[in-house]
Amino acid sequence: MSVLTPLLLRGLTGSARRLPVPCARVHSKPPREQLGTMDIAIGLTSCFVCFLLPSGWVLSHLENYKKRE
């Protein structure tokens, strides 16, 4: 890298620092109905069964997939 590289990079990013960043104003309504403990438990269980269980099975049988038969 040359000696001028940091100066060039600072010159390119210097103008971007002065630009204003718009602030998003996001508002939402309160939920129509509160989630209960059972709803949350069912949701977490279904996520576990759908995503983590198959990937865990594949990872535990990875050595079997590496073998050529």
From Swiss-Prot:
In response to mitochondrial stress, the precursor protein is ubiquitinated by the SIFI complex in the cytoplasm before mitochondrial import, leading to its degradation. Within the SIFI complex, UBR4 initiates ubiquitin chain that are further elongated or branched by KCMF1. It is a single-pass membrane protein. GO terms for biological process: mitochondrial electron transport, cytochrome c to oxygen. InterPro entries: Cyt_c_oxidase_su8, Cyt_c_oxidase_su8_sf. It is found in: Mitochondrion inner membrane. Residues 26-36 are mitochondrial matrix. The keyword Oxidoreductase does not apply. One of its GO terms (cellular component) is respiratory chain complex IV. Component of the cytochrome c oxidase (complex IV, CIV), a multisubunit enzyme composed of 14 subunits. The complex is composed of a catalytic core of 3 subunits MT-CO1, MT-CO2 and MT-CO3, encoded in the mitochondrial DNA, and 11 supernumerary subunits COX4I, COX5A, COX5B, COX6A, COX6B, COX6C, COX7A, COX7B, COX7C, COX8 and NDUFA4, which are encoded in the nuclear genome. Belongs to the cytochrome c oxidase VIII family. This is Cytochrome c oxidase subunit 8A, mitochondrial. It comes from Otolemur crassicaudatus.
